[in-house]
From Swiss-Prot:
Pathway: Secondary metabolite biosynthesis
Originating organism: Armillaria gallica (Bulbous honey fungus)
Record InterPro entries: Cyt_P450 (IPR001128), Cyt_P450_E_grp-I (IPR002401), Cyt_P450_sf (IPR036396), Cytochrome_P450_fung (IPR050364)
Function, as annotated: Cytochrome P450 monooxygenase, part of the gene cluster that mediates the biosynthesis of melleolides, a range of antifungal and phytotoxic polyketide derivatives composed of an orsellinic acid (OA) moiety esterified to various sesquiterpene alcohols. The first step in melleolides biosynthesis is performed by the delta(6)-protoilludene synthase PRO1 which catalyzes the cyclization of farnesyl diphosphate to protoilludene. The orsellinic acid synthase armB produces OA by condensing acetyl-CoA with 3 malonyl-CoA units in a three-round chain elongation reaction folowed by a C2-C7 ring closure.
Cofactor: heme
Glycosylation: residue positions: N450
Keyword field contains Ribosomal protein: no
Membrane topology classification: Single-pass membrane protein
Protein name according to UniProt: Cytochrome P450 monooxygenase ARMGADRAFT_1018420
Assigned protein family: Belongs to the cytochrome P450 family.
Sequence positions that bind heme: C443
Length: 521
């Protein structure tokens, strides 16, 4: 009986197996997943997770030599694509921005800790569009001139502080960056790095950075965990407490400006612009206060980071410092400080700003984008939900674009044969680098940052020489040119000492005179 049944059933099973295999084969052959970009093979379950440890920008650069400008990684089931050329990054993130302007989901850092109000993390949608439009109108190239007086005053204080306490040059850079951004956002300059507002916002940045790190919370891998009641989930309770605390902080700063606007005694600031245009942008006070706070948190860290790298470059490449000082002597002279009125006449200083942003990036892999729909690029399939990372480190140091000396600090690469600023590479939007990002997510504060860097660099080089420090025997102190440390949202050079002296006899007196005219004694 068993043998008869087996003989009757076997052909059916064979036919079924043939159909299933044929169907599966056809599905596989037709599946776009067969055409993923090339990339390293991963391990079972975790995929390429181990490749993403350490300095990712160096790993991506090395792997790019084998796999090309478009690389695919499987990160524990999450598709990730790395963009290793300016053209590929611009093709996708700029020219197909409609598909690639989202951010990866981050339940703790974005949804809970910041209530979806942190514009750099906010998912692509209506809230982001309204916040982005408001920020753009307050910080676009046509209006940032109103911040010139603040930036000039802060550059004077920076220069005076460094000349008075050269051993604390980095502290003065960080104070100035915080003060300038705080003044431009809230018209409330802090008194020092220890100012409660600065300390509280720096604490916010540190907590946010920890929460946003990959693998920081299991809920990012198991989204159902977000529905666990707060009393049973310490991570959720702490994130909610952070949101309450930080909302109160940002709203307090914002309401201070609101009170001054009501009295009619406010000065130009981003917060006052947001308040005056609140109805037009349809943003709540909470959304506006978080938008202003985000601009401070992002701007202060990045500007001070760039200035630290620039200081290192002045020591390692002294010939660029001398050329910049020669330009300052020719245009400004030695009887007054540089100002924004000199901007058009100082092309080498402006080129130095571009080079400082290109040579060492404060964020070597930028902020990730996410695709919102399936796409095909150059024959390769990029599925919806893919995280895309532009390897800014390599994009800014590509020898095919910047020449064989791309790894070196050389502002002259941004000048033409007549010594004027040359047009930037095709996909850099006239910045001559891609440090500010791409597409609809490009840094909205880049014009403010460029201006701050210009006046800080011009004034410091006008007044001082920056050289390599030595020990008591005149032996140069160690200097790690290639190393870096990760500090919150940015990377900074390994701490180093610098020898800073007045460039000519009257320099310090002129700076002090300007400082007193600002009301500081």
């Amino acid at each position: 009986m068993t043998r008869i049944l087996s003989e009757e059933v076997s052909p059916i099973w064979i036919l079924t197996a043939i159909v299933v295999v044929a169907y599966t084969t056809v599905r596989y052959l037709r599946s776009p997943w067969r055409n993923l970009p090339p990339g390293p093979r991963g391990l079972p379950l975790i995929g390429n997770l181990l490749e993403l440890r350490g300095k990712q920008w160096l790993t991506f650069t090395e792997l790019g030599k084998k796999y090309g400008d478009l690389m695919y990684f499987n990160v524990a089931g999450q598709p990730l694509v790395v963009l290793n050329s300016q053209k590929v990054a611009a093709d996708l993130l700029d020219r197909r921005a409609g598909k690639y302007s989202d951010r990866p989901r981050n339940i703790v850092a974005s949804d809970i800790m910041t209530g979806g109000n942190l514009v750099v993390f906010t998912r692509y949608g209506d809230v982001w569009r309204r916040m982005r439009k408001a920020a753009h109108e307050g910080l676009n190239k046509g209006v940032v001139y109103k911040y010139h007086p603040i930036q000039t005053a802060e550059a004077v204080l920076l220069t005076a502080g460094v000349l008075a306490e050269p051993e604390k040059w980095n502290s003065h850079i960080r104070r100035t960056a915080a003060s300038a951004i705080m003044s431009m956002v809230y018209d409330t300059p802090p008194t020092s790095e220890q100012d409660p507002s600065v300390k509280n916002i720096n604490d916010f940045v540190a907590r946010l950075t920890r929460a946003a790190m990959p693998g920081a919370h299991f809920v990012e891998f198991f989204p159902w965990m977000r529905y666990i009641p707060s009393k049973y989930a310490k991570w959720k309770r702490e994130a909610e407490e952070s949101y309450t605390k930080d909302s109160a902080m940002f709203e307090g700063l914002f309401n201070g400006v609101k009170d001054r606007v009501a009295k009619g005694d406010e000065r130009p600031s981003l917060a006052s612009t947001l308040i005056q245009d609140a109805g037009r942008h349809d943003l709540t006070d909470r959304e506006n206060s978080w938008l202003a706070g985000t601009m401070y948190a992002a701007g202060a860290e990045t500007t001070s980071g760039v200035m630290s790298w620039w200081t290192l470059a002045m020591i390692v490449y002294p010939e660029t410092q001398k050329r910049a000082q020669a330009e300052l002597d020719a245009v400004v002279g030695r009887d007054r400080l540089p100002s924004f009125a000199d901007y058009e006449h100082l092309p080498y200083i402006r080129a130095m700003v571009k080079e400082a942003l290109r040579w060492r990036m404060v964020d070597p892999v930028g902020l990730p984008h996410t695709s919102t729909e399936d796409d095909v690029y150059d024959g390769y399939f990029i599925p919806a939900g893919t995280i895309l990372i532009a390897n800014v480190w390599h994009l800014n140091r590509d020898p095919e674009i910047y020449g064989p000396d791309a790894e070196h600090f050389n502002p002259a690469r941004h000048l033409d044969k007549d010594g004027k600023l040359a047009p930037g590479p095709a996909d850099t939007k006239e910045e001559s680098h891609v440090t500010y990002g791409f597409g609809r997510r490009i840094c909205v504060g880049r014009h403010v940052a460029n201006n701050s860097l210009f006046i800080d660099i011009a004034m410091m080089l006008w007044a001082m020489n920056i050289e390599r420090a030595t020990d008591e025997n005149g032996v140069p102190l160690p200097l790690d040119v290639d190393g870096c440390i990760e500090d919150g949202l940015v990377t900074r050079p390994v701490p180093f000492k610098a020898k800073i002296t007045p460039r000519f006899q009257e320099a310090q007196a002129i700076v002090e005179q300007e400082r007193e005219l600002l009301g500081y004694h």
